[in-house]
Amino acid sequence: MDELAGWQNGYDSKVGAKLVKEMIERDVNHPCIILWSNGNEGGWNTQTDPLFAQYDRLQKRHMVHPWADFNDLDTHHYPTYLTGVARFTNGYKVFMPTEFMHAMYDQGGGAGLRDFWDRWCTNPLFAGGFIWVYCDEAPKRSDKGGILDSDKSNAPDGVVGPRREKEGSYYAIRAQ
């Protein structure tokens, strides 16, 4: 999934339109992109929704709004185990939480994954899920001799490190 990154608020239409176009032109041929996400954490601008189809004319990938039932997908973040089961029992949309496990701050992205996976994978409405966050966010600091600054425990700690080295969460997830 390729996300029009933001935080709580969506971009205004002028800025959002420019960013959608740039993102799709940059990533349209990337083999791992199966969905476009118009925002994150509740922030999106519905006026930019049509631009995803306009710029992705060839593959016409789905565009989603995280945390929402939108475009035939239920992408709610961080559902509990039983919430997911209820969505299968009572729902009719494909369920694919755009964030459902948390590896940040090395909270063990694989902790509890087997329980979710064993139950959820038995239902045809389940299409998988996304773990936050893939890699450590550690900018290279030119003012500090080129060190990778992860701000101690205040920066996201992902499944892999800032140099893509495998961390504990990687092995826990891989074992699932």
Segments predicted by a language model, with ranges:
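Substrate-binding/catalytic cleft of secreted carbohydrate-active enzymes
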Residues: M1-G168
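Surface beta-strand/loop "capping" patches
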Residues: K166-Q176
